[in-house]
Amino acid sequence: MPYSPGVESASVEGIWQALKVFRGAGIDEGKLRIKSMKGLKRTVRKYGEVVGHRTGVAGTELLPYEQARRRIYLPSYRWVLENRLADLVTELRETSAERDIVLLDYTTNSQVEDLTKPLSHAALLRAHLAGEWPWTV
């Protein structure tokens, strides 16, 4: 987990939600343990305005949304693809070399700087499969 050596999460979304800081609530380490994806989201309706994402569970820096995407979400996502899903990624790469594959998603936003919409998981996976992971800090 970025900025938290030795700390693990059951999901990338768990990291994202756990490190989200609201005007009315700090981080929530319990989100790191959720495997079912139920009760994972933390919303402005319940906690108030998002003020940033903490740099790790013991961090003191708050990152604005785009920087949090670049420094927390994208490295976490890529780590999972390379370390937990490497066999599946290899299989997808091999299949895509033989024929077209279709990746479906609810969103199509592939622009990290477009903060009006969530990032597309399909776009992130496509970029990774193509060896075109362009997102850096």
Model-derived segments and spans:
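Charged, low-complexity intrinsically disordered segments
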Residues: 1-137
